[in-house]
């Protein structure tokens, strides 16, 4: 096969990153790692950045621009040239689920109207709202363009910690005590007694530890609530669960089979440690580390792996998820699910599968194969 024929035989993958989310920079870092591990002999990468204002712009394959440098986090800049993904070859939506190819075209700038790529599959490496919450997935579903990862329902439910716990409870998966607030208010004496101290106050729909506070006394509660509501209009107050934080990856193959990874234990959370990793620890100082596989009894590891798949199925997930638990004296308790887990250099999802012998490149290839199945 000639080099030109090989080029046309490659699968064209549009990698979306950035987005209108507090996790914008994390998405950029994840996308850089994904692009680095897409085999150029097999895939033609079309990077598309989404600015914090929501503009779609030509992205970069220079992944050095998609890395953190201390506190200097990568961002998608608007250079004035905008692009859009159109469908059906004429800018019209295809039938849902048709798996039609999309056209990536310029909509502003000197090449406005020009198609510069035929897209076989979209890899939405988007974290947080307006990307991981079912919004982008809905657009792609309506257009009939294939994409990596979860659909609208699983993405929306997984983004919302409240609905994740509701579905998990219905499926018989252990979860902790929580309280949902839609506006700041004082807790009642009964609520305080039920939750106890400390509590964690979180935006219900967010990630990367943004907007989260640990409250050790009720005098700290008002400030924690204000911070959480500055990031979301729905807040979850969770009781402290004593146990190590353990993460488990789930991967669905092209044939529909579902596997879970060996779990990872976040160091510093074992033996009832009561801290938590904030954004800086995860992405600026890089102080997060983990032991893989988690140093837990074989029976506990087996239970975590099974519960991860049960959670995946309870939410109707497809392709990918990372499921987080607390390993308590009485067994694993669900913390949350990530329907588009991070792919950054410190992210646990690729590391856990690497411990199973699945390389980063094989992992992203498996996810694309599932999307195209």
From Swiss-Prot:
Keywords: ATP-binding, Cell shape, Cell wall biogenesis/degradation, Cytoplasm, Ligase, Magnesium, Manganese, Metal-binding, Nucleotide-binding, Peptidoglycan synthesis. Mg(2+) 1 binds at residues 324, 336. Pathway: Cell wall biogenesis; peptidoglycan biosynthesis. This is D-alanine--D-alanine ligase. GO terms for cellular component: cytosol. GO terms for molecular function: ATP binding; D-alanine-D-alanine ligase activity; metal ion binding. The keyword Disulfide bond does not apply. The keyword Nucleotide-binding applies. Binds 2 magnesium or manganese ions per subunit. Pfam families: Dala_Dala_lig_C, Dala_Dala_lig_N. Its cofactor is Mg(2+); Mn(2+). Belongs to the D-alanine--D-alanine ligase family. GO terms for biological process: cell wall organization; peptidoglycan biosynthetic process; regulation of cell shape. It catalyses: 2 D-alanine + ATP = D-alanyl-D-alanine + ADP + phosphate + H(+). Cell wall formation. ATP binds at residues 192-247.
């Amino acid at each position: 096969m000639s080099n030109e024929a090989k080029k046309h035989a490659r699968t064209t993958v549009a990698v979306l990153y950035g987005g209108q989310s507090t996790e914008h920079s994390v998405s950029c870092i994840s996308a850089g790692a994904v692009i680095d591990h897409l085999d150029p002999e097999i895939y033609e990468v079309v990077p598309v950045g989404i600015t914090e204002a929501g503009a779609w712009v030509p992205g970069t394959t220079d992944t050095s621009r998609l890395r953190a440098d201390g506190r200097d986090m990568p961002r998608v800049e608007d250079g004035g040239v905008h692009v859009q993904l159109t469908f059906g070859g004429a800018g019209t939506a295809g039938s849902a689920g048709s798996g039609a190819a999309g056209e990536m075209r310029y909509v502003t700038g000197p090449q406005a109207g020009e198609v510069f790529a035929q897209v076989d599959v979209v890899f939405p490496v988007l974290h947080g709202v307006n990307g991981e919450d079912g919004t982008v997935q809905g657009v792609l579903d309506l257009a009939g363009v294939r994409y990596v990862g979860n659909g609208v329902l699983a993405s929306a439910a997984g983004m919302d910690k409240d609905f994740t716990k509701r579905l998990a409870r219905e499926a018989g998966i252990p979860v902790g005590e929580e309280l949902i607030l839609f506006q700041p208010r004082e807790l009642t004496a009964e609520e305080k007694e039920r939750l106890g101290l400390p509590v964690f106050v979180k935006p219900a729909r967010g990630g990367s530890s943004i907007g989260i506070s640990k409250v050790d006394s009720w005098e700290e509660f008002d400030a924690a609530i204000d911070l959480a509501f500055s990031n979301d209009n729905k807040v979850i107050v969770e009781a402290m669960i004593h146990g190590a934080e353990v993460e488990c990856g789930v991967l669905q193959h092209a044939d529909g089979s579902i596997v879970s990874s060996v779990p990872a234990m976040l160091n510093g959370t074992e033996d009832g440690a009561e801290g938590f990793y904030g954004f800086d620890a995860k992405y600026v100082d890089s102080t997060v580390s983990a032991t893989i596989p988690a140093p837990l009894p074989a029976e506990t590891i087996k239970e975590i792996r099974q519960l991860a798949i049960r959670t995946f199925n309870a939410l109707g997930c497809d392709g990918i998820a990372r499921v987080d638990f607390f390993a308590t004296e009485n067994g694993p308790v669900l913390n949350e699910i990530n329907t588009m887990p991070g792919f950054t250099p410190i992210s646990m999802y690729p590391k856990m599968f690497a411990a199973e012998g699945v390389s980063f490149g094989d992992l992203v290839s498996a996810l694309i194969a599932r999307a195209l199945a």
